Amino acid sequence: RSYIERHGLRWSVVESLPVTETIKYGGPDRDEQIEIYKQSMRNLAAEGIHTICYNFMPVLDWARTDLMHPNADGTSNLYFSFAHFAYFDIHILKREGAVEDWRKFKIEGVERDILAEVETIRQTMTQEQEQQLIENIVIKTQGFVSGNFKEGEKHPVELFRRLLALYKDIDTDKLRENMKYFLSAIMPVCDECDI
């Protein structure tokens, strides 16, 4: 905070205060985890932070397929490629139903032959590039946000699969129900702390 303030800025938003997987899928220690979350909210409010963002997506938070995407002017930025993410889903994660899900893929209502793009990637993807894609999607972005993954994780894809398996019986309605439960539990703290 002092570093930010020394440079003329004010810390006013936290993005993101991670919601644990057990809260999202409704695990046995959900209420305990919600209490921890509520205390974190109180702690942030006590420091003058009254805007807290969160994510309720299973396993993934924000994901990027390239952390150093080159721009024409020589700079770089974070980048997300649906085709590379689909490649990860189909050929690395090997998620059941992935091919069918991507076959029906649309962006803003426009169909896109993502499977043809995935095939092009598959034909040119090196082992090093595949490892970098795993690093970017699983370790770098998810480890940073959720703490579920750590640098040096020996089997990140297997861990990713195990976490995803926790949602096997969680459909959209159940996830929405779990989110409603979470929000109902934290709203009194939002009111109490002006969040």
Task: Give, region by region, the residue ranges found by the protein language model.
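Asp-box/BNR beta-propeller blade signature and adjacent active/binding-site loops
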Residues: 5-12
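A cross-family glycoside hydrolase active-site/sugar-binding cleft signature
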Residues: 12-15, 53-55
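Nucleotide/phosphate-binding sheet-loop regions of phosphoryl- and nucleotidyl-transfer enzymes
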Residues: 20
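Active-site acidic/histidine proton-transfer and metal-coordination neighborhood
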Residues: 23-195
